[in-house]
Amino acid sequence: MLTFNKSVVSCAAIIYALLLVVLPLTTQQFVKAESNENYGTVIGIDLGTTYSCVGVMKAGRVEIIPNDQGNRITPSYVAFTEDERLVGDAAKNQIASNPTNTIFDIKRLIGHRFDDKVIQKEIKHLPYKVKDQDGRPVVEAKVNGELKTFTAEEISAMILGKMKQIAEDYLGKKVTHAVVTVPAYFNDAQRQATKDAGTIAGLEVLRIVNEPTAAAIAYGLDKTDEEKHIIVYDLGGGTFDVSLLTIAGGAFEVLATAGDTHLGGEDFDYRVVRHFIKVFKKKHGIDISDNSKALAKLKREVEKAKRTLSSQMSTRIEIDSFVDGIDFSESLSRAKFEELNMDLFKKTLKPVQQVLDDAKMKPDEIDDVVFVGGSTRIPKVQELIENFFNGKKISKGINPDEAVAFGAAVQGGVLSGEEGVEDIVLIDVNPLTLGIETSGGVMTTLIKRNTPIPTQKSQIFSTAADNQPVVLIQVYEGERAMAKDNNLLGKFELTGIPPAPRGVPQIEVTFTLDSNGILKVSATDKGTGKSNSITITNDKGRLSKEEIEKKIEEAEKFAQQDKELREKVESRNALENYAHSLKNQANDENGFGAKLEEDDKETLLDAINEALEFLEDNFDTATKDEFDEQKEKLSKVAYPITSKLYDAPPTSDEEDEDDWDHDEL
């Protein structure tokens, strides 16, 4: 156990004061030093609970990149079917038929221990299985007929990999560096796990940026004149953050932040789902609480209804053959939706008040309130915030779904040396107080919450007993007075302390918090110079270096499988299109078919039917090469017959095939 050495308080206080004075300057130098590296194109990714978004800065402008469906936001869903992995829209669209193998809300699991209360509460609502593996939650899904487990980092990596692919398809080149956003209230372990997910996805995550800070950049990029105090109210699908910032001349300084990493649109949906479970049971005597397929259908329709209620006063939820052949048909009014969720809506006001108190400001000193996240479209949420700020109208100049990715892309532009953003400076803060346990179980603070980062703080401690050879450094985050009531981040020992009376040895403990909010702690015996340190890794919740390397290999294997499947489907489609095109032509009695000799026509149709039968019998099981062989076989029959009809026949099989081989629209 450690004790606090009071004799060095004044010295430490002076050092701390000096640190704060020089911090804005050192932060600016840090950002600009990073931007001198040659990273190539750096994309910005908003890795959301329910939806993700990717942007890039090109020629001084930010572009939000649409996915292959033309959508600018992509569902944070991963699904495993019998023969493929789906990510994004395709995964979400099939959840009703495949609920136990469709993974979503993974952001609510990442960086947690399995026995965390929030995780135990969360997994009760999920249709897929969450298991305990070495103290951390892993999800279980059936892949190619076998049960396989995935860490939250792996699933997040699949989503990040999808966003990476979207950017690469758009840019036409490989992307290896990114800025990724996280909720401001994410703790150290959650930030580390998010960086690990990026590594597994083949991305070097240059910066972890807090979501409200990124949104503030989107809001304030073109507002470089007078100083403004703004509040960013970020209510997304699964997390909630509030940050109070000062914006002036390209500098974005966070003064205070607060939030709840388990509050968002998914919670509002679940309240409505729970309501309709009771209604259906009362009407039909059937409890669907454990029916994953019925729940997936209901959840999907409830989410649609919630969106509708943002612009209408009521809507109707209709689901054919909901369960046991019974149709579901119920109305939902905006008033009922608000009644079911009012306590959750009001719960968001507490962090708003907290950031004002921490920054020592009043509501009327705030120049603008910026809404971010899809859940801020809920009319009652808007009304509550406007009333809180005495009728102040909410700023609606930025897209709440895209603002975070926009800001991340700007930060990516800063790091890659894009023109027009040279003067942008981010000064963010740590969301929670950091300290160590000292004698009596007390939490002794080294870095207070809302301290600007990056930062470093040192303090001298001593031994609690005579001749104590070892001190245990236990690192905590949280606001409670006793260490046991806070969150243990990690611990390590400093050994080999020479025998001495209690209180004599001087142990210097140093906390270093980097610009990503990731903590390193060191302890040095000033008498012997002996030291030890750790980068906080939350041993029970974080992947080891070896595990990360293994996950990278598995991710590459999945990517290869995806590539092989895509090539197989392309070959299958090419054969199918070619066969059907030939068949239609051969049967056209007013055109091509009328010119064929009867024997040739019969030979051609036999070959076509053989190819179509092969497709029908081997649609899922044949390989790419087998589909290609069938197409070549059909081509060898078709070519001599079709070439008779032309004065100038094609010079090769390949040219002939091109006449018939077209992608379907």
Curated annotation (Swiss-Prot):
GO terms for cellular component: endoplasmic reticulum lumen. Residues 136-290 are annotated as: Nucleotide-binding (NBD). Its main location: endoplasmic reticulum. The chaperone activity is regulated by ATP-induced allosteric coupling of the nucleotide-binding (NBD) and substrate-binding (SBD) domains. In the ADP-bound and nucleotide-free (apo) states, the two domains have little interaction. In contrast, in the ATP-bound state the two domains are tightly coupled, which results in drastically accelerated kinetics in both binding and release of polypeptide substrates. J domain-containing co-chaperones stimulate the ATPase activity and are required for efficient substrate recognition. GO terms for molecular function: ATP binding; ATP hydrolysis activity; ATP-dependent protein folding chaperone. Residues 410-510 are annotated as: Substrate-binding (SBD). GO terms for biological process: response to unfolded protein. It is found in: Endoplasmic reticulum lumen. It comes from the Eukaryota. Its EC number is 3.6.4.10. Keywords: ATP-binding, Chaperone, Endoplasmic reticulum, Hydrolase, Nucleotide-binding, Signal, Stress response. SUPFAM superfamilies: Actin-like ATPase domain, Heat shock protein 70kD (HSP70), C-terminal subdomain, Heat shock protein 70kD (HSP70), peptide-binding domain. Pfam families: HSP70 (PF00012). It catalyses: ATP + H2O = ADP + phosphate + H(+). Probably plays a role in facilitating the assembly of multimeric protein complexes inside the ER. Is required for secretory polypeptide translocation. May physically associate with SEC63 protein in the endoplasmic reticulum and this interaction may be regulated by ATP hydrolysis. Residues 652-665 have a biased composition (Acidic residues). It comes from Pichia angusta (Yeast). Residues 644-665 are annotated as: Disordered. Belongs to the heat shock protein 70 family. This is Endoplasmic reticulum chaperone BiP.
